[in-house]
């Protein structure tokens, strides 16, 4: 029994020496004693290749490469102890979830924390750490007793409570495992116990290579190996000079020095012979003087400079994507020009979550075979999502999001249907569920679902159309596709008495859905498209899910569990599933994490993402215990993993390892922005490298090749897939700025695409975008007639929409596009309710021959409650009755109607105008409808403007009859003559024109009436600020002022007094007008003469004719208006359709100038020739 150290700096040949010794021994004695070669898990594959890479050694039974966990399997198979069931990470998380749920009420700190994302991952890591550091539950309990007895501060009490929770959960976990199961950490403890019984290890020659430190658990394994083996050889990256000096935590080799001393101490304790250490002083790895210099002087202070050309390259990239593309181009160059193989190249990085997706995409585009040494989670695979969402459907009462997450996995689809057809139908089905607010019991009820197109609150026709019946049948068919398998599983889960039966219910759910066949179809499709990675995913996921169910049954099969706990535990297990890495092929670029990689002897290394806070890593407190808490436990004798401070001290060694992997070339790069455009800073590590290599230039990598020289641009020509975007970029430059010197070269590349049989069609679609202009072409007369017909019948709102944006009008009224209907109460629904409620109250008053003035406040309250109760079942598929929240909202809406009724009562008492008609239709046909506003357009098309007028008021005096329009609005609004001029506010003046043109309708003896004005009535329940001692009357007066109607009224003092008979001088509390003492109007009055009203009405006719002409002539310009801070695009539903983009030459707003009312009126006169 002896111990031998082989030490040396990086690249000194430690592994090579050991491998050569083994190979020589195998050549001399192929059947001698066992030779064990122990390496970290990540090194096993490459070490096996290296071991049998010699021409004289093509294979061996005597020598085997192991990691500690693989050695545990080997020994336990030999001597026994492997009969207990292995539980993987997913199983551990599931068991911990169950333990936490059952212990929840007794936990002090983790009761709420258990609901946070990642909690069980951290808890599992903490328990694994306890085991690796030989800390038992009883040790943790003793620590809690010690802490609890001496806790005085809040921080100490928190730590004591945290340790108490950990002790409870750790103890329960160990009790659940004992005698039945083994987790990955238990294998190492068993290995310690079983190694003395192993004949396989006894007398073996043992090499331990590639480690820098050992956990206490691993150190115990090393102890047993030294006792059982003939000789143990351990390699450590360590400078011999360091051993001659006192240990300093700032030393580069501090960690490996401690490891060296710990192992020697173990050897002394076991009286193991310690052979003379073999120090290796040469640098055989490095074929480059620059890399040899970097390794030899890495830790020197001040930095030792290397002058002259170096094989170290530094790149700064515009962004992360440009950085990865730069790496891809250089890899292709090395392979093409310098005879590198892909396996000679490695890419090292730390923040893989930012890079992996981009690297997969770009390396595939650049045709670079690659292997990412990182396990991917299965959480996004359709099968995992299907199980998780189906369980959430059942435990969460059939919520919309869970149902359609399950639907979108496409595993609920019948096996024999076309997926494309089913997707379209399910999209329609989802729209129905959103519109009708389908969830909860409606899914499980046997009552068929109904489909009716919503028309209006006044539509009481119960007849169903053929198209509605057809849609209803489809909806119920699709409902059964979705709910039938889930309801079957739901019934089985509710009947289940044990976890085993619940797992069986999940399995039967998958089997009845033909999931294995569907996954096989997905695998075949992936293989046919050349995506072999995803093809294997579909195989792995089924096996892992079945293994998870087996583990669940093995651990907890006979236990009873609530459905919610079963769902939580299953979800926790599913989240922990990972795809196994496919072993790399013989010729791939290796992409690996800096902290976990153990690669060696690659020719070129690319270290990417070298940004501040990443390399070196910024300090982060992660996991269950903070650094301060770890220090407290360490002081009390419990050794755990290194603190953040210790980890930061080890960063220099990690970076040293990182830059000493390559034999010939080292590339270091960092992006200046991430994928979202956020600024990133270069790491101080790059500055260190620049100081060591002052002649090395920092090259900037960009995706914009315009500023590069011709020779630099040539490097951007890679694969056809990648190069096409750069061709586009250059041709865009030519299009905008004309000929450039380098463009002739890019014309040659362009000619390749247009002449290549393979690429001609593919590239034409992309290149056609060069001449793309986001401009809508005018419709032909024939198309316009097909869309709009020979007779246009439209509302005033439609005409205003055209003037806001012609393309929005085309999308809504030409193409009939609309957003999908969602079961929610929007502003239009509330507006419709307000209109209907006030109309019902007014109709009741008319039937009773009463007016608003006749109502008492109590009657206002009663009537508002009655009409809201009548309307609620009719509005938006009974939305106001659908939940407690909406019931509360119904009460708030009733209060608004009540308040509005009171104000209308006050207005009626103060006004000579009385309502003579409500919700007056014009151009609608039928009894009571006024005629439309009709136009004969120059191209022969007839146009009718139709609509519905909220309220018509009439007043009479000795000067004649006056009519005014009242429009109810759920938001504050005034009449802006500038918007009238631009055709954006035509509604009120149109209504006034219609009623004055048909004045005889409301006059007993016929005749004409004069326009009295147009006013907006704001329906709301305002809050007013008053002094503390204000009386109720004063408060009511302030509220009344909040309801002052804005608009435009006739500039006649008598008419204004008819509107507010309390007005003598000053401002009216009812309308936006006021009188001075001399009888003239105040400056703030919104008034117009009768002649001006006539001009305005004439202008409205003129505007409608122009709009009708443009519509019928096919004008669909993408030209939204912008006026001050208002723009047509702000609330437009069609932005994703028109793709309006101000950065494009053809896309600019129509900027409308704001004007005073007098200026707008003058322009209106000019347009119509008015006086």
UniProtKB/Swiss-Prot annotation:
Cofactor note: Binds 1 [4Fe-4S] cluster.
UvrD-like helicase ATP-binding domain: residues covered: 1-390
Sites where the protein binds [4Fe-4S] cluster: 805, 1129, 1132, 1138
Domain UvrD-like helicase C-terminal: 281-587
InterPro entries attached to this UniProt entry: ADDB_N (IPR049035), DNA_helicase_suAddB (IPR014140), DNA_helicase_UvrD-like_C (IPR014017), P-loop_NTPase (IPR027417), PDDEXK-like_dom_sf (IPR011604), PDDEXK_AddAB-type (IPR038726)
Enzyme class, spelled out: hydrolase
EC number from the UniProt entry: 3.1.-.-
Record note on quaternary structure: Heterodimer of AddA and AddB.
Chain's role: The heterodimer acts as both an ATP-dependent DNA helicase and an ATP-dependent, dual-direction single-stranded exonuclease. Recognizes the chi site generating a DNA molecule suitable for the initiation of homologous recombination. The AddB subunit has 5' -> 3' nuclease activity but not helicase activity.
Protein name as catalogued: ATP-dependent helicase/deoxyribonuclease subunit B
Organism: Bacillus cereus (strain ATCC 10987 / NRS 248)
């Amino acid at each position: 029994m002896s111990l031998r150290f082989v030490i040396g700096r990086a690249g000194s040949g430690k592994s090579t020496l050991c491998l050569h010794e083994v190979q020589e021994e195998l050549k001399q004695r192929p059947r001698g004693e066992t030779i064990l070669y122990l390496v970290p898990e990540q090194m096993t594959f490459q070490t096996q290749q290296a071991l049998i890479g010699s021409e004289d050694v093509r294979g061996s039974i005597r020598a085997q490469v192991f990691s500690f966990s693989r050695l545990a399997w080997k020994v336990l198979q030999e001597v026994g102890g492997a009969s207990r069931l292995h539980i993987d990470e997913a199983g551990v998380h599931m068991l911990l979830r169950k333990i936490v749920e059952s212990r929840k009420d007794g936990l002090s700190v983790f009761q709420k924390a258990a609901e946070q994302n990642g909690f069980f991952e951290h808890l599992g890591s903490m328990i694994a750490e306890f085991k690796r550091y030989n800390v038992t539950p009883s040790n943790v309990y003793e620590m809690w007793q010690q802490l609890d007895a001496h806790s005085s501060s809040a921080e100490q009490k928190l730590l004591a409570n945290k340790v108490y929770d950990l002790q409870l959960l750790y103890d329960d976990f160990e009790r659940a495992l004992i005698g039945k199961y083994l987790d990955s950490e238990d294998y190492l403890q068993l290995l310690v116990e079983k190694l003395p019984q192993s004949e396989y290890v006894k007398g073996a020659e043992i090499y331990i290579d590639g480690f820098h430190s050992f956990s206490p658990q691993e150190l115990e394994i090393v102890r047993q190996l030294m006792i059982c083996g003939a000789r143990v050889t351990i390699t450590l990256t360590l400078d011999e000079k360091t051993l001659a000096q006192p240990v300093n935590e700032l030393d580069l080799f501090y960690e490996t020095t401690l490891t060296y001393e710990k192992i020697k101490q173990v050897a002394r304790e076991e009286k193991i012979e310690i052979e003379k250490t073999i120090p290796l002083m040469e640098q055989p790895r490095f074929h480059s003087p620059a890399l040899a210099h970097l390794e030899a002087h890495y830790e020197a202070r001040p930095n030792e400079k290397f002058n002259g050309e170096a094989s170290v390259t530094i790149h700064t990239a515009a962004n992360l994507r440009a950085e990865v593309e730069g790496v891809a181009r250089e890899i292709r160059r090395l392979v093409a020009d310098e005879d590198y193989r892909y396996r000679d190249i490695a890419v090292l990085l730390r923040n893989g979550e930012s890079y992996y997706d981009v690297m997969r995409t770009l390396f595939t585009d650049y045709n670079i075979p690659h292997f990412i040494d990182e396990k991917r989670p299965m959480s996004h695979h359709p099968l995992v999502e299907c199980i998780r969402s189906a369980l959430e459907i059942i435990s969460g009462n059939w919520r919309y999001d869970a149902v359609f997450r399950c639907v979108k996995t496409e595993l609920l689809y019948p096996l024999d249907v076309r997926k494309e057809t089913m997707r379209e139908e399910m999209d329609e089905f989802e729209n129905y569920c959103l519109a009708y607010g389908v969830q909860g019991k409606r899914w499980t009820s046997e009552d068929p679902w109904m489909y009716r197109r919503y028309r209006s609150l006044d539509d009481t026709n119960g007849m169903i159309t053929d198209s509605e019946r057809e849609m209803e049948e489809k909806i119920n068919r699709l409902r059964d596709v979705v709910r039938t398998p889930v309801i079957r599983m739901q019934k089985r889960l509710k009947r289940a008495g044990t976890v085993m039966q619940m797992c069986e219910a999940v399995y039967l759910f998958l089997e009845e859905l033909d999931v294995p066949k569907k996954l096989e179809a997905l695998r075949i499709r992936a293989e046919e498209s050349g995506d072999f990675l995803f093809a294997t995913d579909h195989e792995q996921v089924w096996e892992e899910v079945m293994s998870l169910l087996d583990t669940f049954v093995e651990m907890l099969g006979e236990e009873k569990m609530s459905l919610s706990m079963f769902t939580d535990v299953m979800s926790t297990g599913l989240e922990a599933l990972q795809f196994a890495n496919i072993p790399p092929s013989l010729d791939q670029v290796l992409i690996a994490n800096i902290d976990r990689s153990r690669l060696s002897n690659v020719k070129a290394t690319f270290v990417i993402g070298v940004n501040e806070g990443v390399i070196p890593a910024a300090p982060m407190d992660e996991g269950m215990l903070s650094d301060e808490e770890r220090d407290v436990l360490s002081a009390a004798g419990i050794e755990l993993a290194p603190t953040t401070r210790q980890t930061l001290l080890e960063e220099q060694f990690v970076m040293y390892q990182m830059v000493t992997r390559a034999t010939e070339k080292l590339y270091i790069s960092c992006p200046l922005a991430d994928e979202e455009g956020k600024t990133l800073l270069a790491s101080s590590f790059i500055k260190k490298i620049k100081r060591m290599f002052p002649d090395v230039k920092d090259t900037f990598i960009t995706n914009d090749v315009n500023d590069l020289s011709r020779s630099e641009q040539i490097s951007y020509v890679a694969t056809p897939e990648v190069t096409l975007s750069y061709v586009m970029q250059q041709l865009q430059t030519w299009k905008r700025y004309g000929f450039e010197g380098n463009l002739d070269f890019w014309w040659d590349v362009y000619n390749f695409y247009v002449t290549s049989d393979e690429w001609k069609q593919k590239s034409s679609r992309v290149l056609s975008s060069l001449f793309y202009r986001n401009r809508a072409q005018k419709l032909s007369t024939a198309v316009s007639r097909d869309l709009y017909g020979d007779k246009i019948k439209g509302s005033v709102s439609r005409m205003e929409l055209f003037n806001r944006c012609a393309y929005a009008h085309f999308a809504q009224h030409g193409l009939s596009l609309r957003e999908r209907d969602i079961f929610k109460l929007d502003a239009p629904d509330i507006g419709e309710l307000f209109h209907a409620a006030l109309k019902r109250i007014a109709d009741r008053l008319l039937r009773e021959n009463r007016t608003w003035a006749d109502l008492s406040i109590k009657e206002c309250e009663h009537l508002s409650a009655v009409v809201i109760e009548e309307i609620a079942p009719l509005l938006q598929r009974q939305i106001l009755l659908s939940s407690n929240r909406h019931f509360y909202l119904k009460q708030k809406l009733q209060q608004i109607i009540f308040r509005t009724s009171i104000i209308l009562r006050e207005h009626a008492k103060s006004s000579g105008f009385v309502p003579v008609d409500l919700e007056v239709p014009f151009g609608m046909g039928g009894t009571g409808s006024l005629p439309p506003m009709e136009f004969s357009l120059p191209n022969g098309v007839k146009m009718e403007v139709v609509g519905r007028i909220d309220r018509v008021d009439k007043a009479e005096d000795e000067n004649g009859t006056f009519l005014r329009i009242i429009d109810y609005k759920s938001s504050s609004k005034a009449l802006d003559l500038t918007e009238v001029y631009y055709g954006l506010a035509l509604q009120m003046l149109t209504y006034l024109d219609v009623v004055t043109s048909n004045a005889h309708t409301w006059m007993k003896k016929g005749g004409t009436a004069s326009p009295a004005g147009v006013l907006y009535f704001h329906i709301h329940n305002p809050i007013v600020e008053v002094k503390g001692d204000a009386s109720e009357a004063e408060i009511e007066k302030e509220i009344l002022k909040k309801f002052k109607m804005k608009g435009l009224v006739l500039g006649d003092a008598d008419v204004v007094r008819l509107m507010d008979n309390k007005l003598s001088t000053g401002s009216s509390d009812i309308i936006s007008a006021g009188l001075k003492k001399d009888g003239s109007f105040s400056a703030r009055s919104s008034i117009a003469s009768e002649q001006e009203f006539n001009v305005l009405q004439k202008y409205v006719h003129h505007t409608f004719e122009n709009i009708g002409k443009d519509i019928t002539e096919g004008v669909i310009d993408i030209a939204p208006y912008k006026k001050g801070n208002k723009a047509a695009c702000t609330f437009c539903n069609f932005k994703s359709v028109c793709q309006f983009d101000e950065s494009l030459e053809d896309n600019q707003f129509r900027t409308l100038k704001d004007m005073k009312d007098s200026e707008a009126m003058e322009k209106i006169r000019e347009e119509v020739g008015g006086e």
